[in-house]
Design a protein with these regions (language model features):
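Right-handed parallel beta-helix
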Residues: 1-9, 17-42, 48-71, 78, ...
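Extracellular glycoside hydrolase catalytic/binding regions
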Residues: 102-105
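Active-site rim elements
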Residues: 125, 152
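Aromatic/acidic polysaccharide-binding cleft in carbohydrate-active enzymes
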Residues: 149
Length: 172
């Protein structure tokens, strides 16, 4: 599948047991997450979208996907392990996403693993642990631009462990 210029999320699976999401490309998604479209989000927070992610899934597996240029919004990252149990992202690629590579979203997202992925020049902060209890990062390669924090500002309240990740600075 190839998703380009979606107004919000690119690909989202919901309430699924062991979904497999592979060989997809999301390009320039979340292009309508802005004040012109969401002029009064109120208490709903409204302007949130990520490229490829699960919602309330058990043992979701995401592999061989590519995400580029997810637009800046309150989420805005390539991948988001959100409110599920056992999500695994492996062998994926991300580049130049407005708010980073991956978010582990809040307390309900448990037992999630991000491994063997490549992130190149994702912006705003490469990872967002966002109050997550136990995210795992394993054997990833992160190319991080000078001045971009590895952990996204104001999304750093969670716990994560890293094992054999490579963080390589790039100059722009």
């Amino acid at each position: 599948n190839y998703v380009k210029a979606a107004g919000g999320d690119g690909i989202t699976v919901m309430y699924a047991l062991r979904p497999l999401v592979k060989h997809n490309t999301a390009d320039s998604v979340a292009c309508e997450m802005n004040d012109r479209i969401y002029s009064e989000p109120g208490n709903r927070l409204g302007k949130v979208a990520a490229a490829i992610w699960p919602w309330k899934c058990k043992d979701a597996l995401f592999r061989y996907n590519e995400v580029t240029d997810t637009r800046l919004n309150q989420d805005g990252m390539a991948y988001d392990a959100d409110s599920g149990d056992g999500t695994v992202y492996e062998y994926n690629y991300s580049r130049m996403n407005g708010c980073g590579c991956v978010m582990f979203c809040l307390e309900e997202a448990i037992h999630n693993t991000f491994r063997h992925n490549v992130s190149y020049d994702d912006l705003g902060g490469t990872i967002s642990p966002a109050s997550n209890p136990d995210a795992r990062l394993e054997q990833n390669i992160f190319y991080v631009r000078d001045g971009v924090p590895f952990v996204r500002n104001h999304m750093d309240g969670g716990n994560y462990t890293e094992s054999n990740d490579r963080i390589i600075p790039i100059e722009k």
